């Protein structure tokens, strides 16, 4: 007979994963990557340390997922703002201004996401979102060049 997870078990497993990710984000916000330990994450999530490793093979994998979740949220906010702006110039200004304001509200987390030294897996996730944000900015600059909001000065050559 094949084991089949009940809806209740599936819900509990998903809840545990969310609790782990939320706890990790909270602790990284307080102390960065280097100061955050898996045992502390587990305790904050109300789980055993070993349970964390059922969901994530390593601390670096967990942190890469935290970085990806937070970065995706920030990228979505910037994209929504840019898309809702009346023109590319306003979109670029408002998106960057919002990004900076949000980063300043949680400087420790922003430093971890943007610049804190980290493991290769975390840095790979970081680069994915740097490219996505630069792509959004380039889209706005290109649109602004087409509509005359920005001068054409070979911005692409710098990227």
Give names to the regions the model predicted.
Residues 1-15:
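N-terminal intrinsically disordered/low-complexity leader segments
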Residues 13-24, 41, 62, 66-70, ...:
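Generic hydrophobic, amphipathic alpha-helix propensity
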Residues 23-27, 98, 102, 136:
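Short amphipathic alpha-helical elements of helix-turn-helix/winged-helix folds
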Residues 19, 27-61, 65:
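Helix-turn-helix
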């Amino acid at each position: 007979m094949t084991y089949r997870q009940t809806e209740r078990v599936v819900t509990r497993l998903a809840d545990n994963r969310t609790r782990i990710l939320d706890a990790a984000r909270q602790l990284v916000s307080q102390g960065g990557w280097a100061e955050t330990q898996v045992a502390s994450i587990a305790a904050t999530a109300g789980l055993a340390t070993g349970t964390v490793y059922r969901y994530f093979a390593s601390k670096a994998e967990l942190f890469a997922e935290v970085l990806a979740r937070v970065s995706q949220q920030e990228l979505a906010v910037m994209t929504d703002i840019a898309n809702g702006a009346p023109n590319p110039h306003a979109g670029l200004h408002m998106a960057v201004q919002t990004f900076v304001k949000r980063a300043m509200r949680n400087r420790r987390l922003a430093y971890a996401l943007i610049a804190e030294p980290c493991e290769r897996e975390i840095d790979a996730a970081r680069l994915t979102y740097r490219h996505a944000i630069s792509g959004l900015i380039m889209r706005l600059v290109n649109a602004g060049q087409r509509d005359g909001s920005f001068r054409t000065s070979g911005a692409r050559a710098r990227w």
